[in-house]
Amino acid sequence: TFLDNTHRNSMHYWNDELHEYLQGTANTYTFTVSSKHEDAVYTVEGNKVAFVYNGKDYYLNIVHVEKDEFTVTATAWSLSFELINENVGAYKSESAMSFEEYVTAFDPERTVRIGINEVSDKRISNEWTGEATVLSRLFSVANVFDAEIEFQTVLNDDYSLKEIVMNVYREHSDNNTGVGEFRG
């Protein structure tokens, strides 16, 4: 199903709002469609919404839907929020490890691929006690490495998900721009 306000027969949307959060560049997207359109049946929790906006790819999971006889309003979260669905346990490194080695330990399914890695020269020993979500642990690893992370969605030409890239930047300081700098 395609949402396209310029195409007469496509399902049109309105009241759409995209929020971008600095930490990890997570996103939420809310939009409304007509419940009378035949494709409105696909606006359900668990389905995906993919689009390109200002040259950036977005791939979001619909997590909440409100329906009445006239409209369907959906809220979708970016896939970085998907990393909150899996937990990891306590972990202690046996020796100093690179950022990438920690990511492999905490994301063995390779949900994300590391792109830019400005801390690739560092090796650190650390211990985590207790359980945490994969997303929380990745932010914790970034903190240990004095780094900031962002997640970048990459779509195929048909708008299916190609991959999620995690870029790692040195933490913002007088000498480093961190995530906040546009890196087009």
PLM regions: where:
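Juxtamembrane "anchor/assembly" segments of surface/extracellular structural proteins
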Residues: 1-44, 77-83
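Surface-exposed charge patches in extracellular/virion surface proteins
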Residues: 8, 36-40, 48, 113, ...
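Short amphipathic beta-strand and strand-loop transition segments with alternating hydrophobic
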Residues: 9-22, 62-67, 151-155
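Intrinsically disordered, low-complexity segments enriched in small/polar residues
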Residues: 14, 22, 53, 113, ...
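Short, solvent-exposed secondary-structure boundary motifs
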Residues: 5-12, 49-57, 137-143
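Hydrophobic, Leu/Ile/Phe/Ala-enriched alpha-helical segments that form helix-helix packing faces
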Residues: 1, 102-110, 138-145, 149
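Short beta-strand-centered interaction patches in the first periplasmic/extracellular domains
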Residues: 57, 64-83, 118-184
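Surface-exposed cap/loop segments at beta↔alpha junctions
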Residues: 37-121, 127
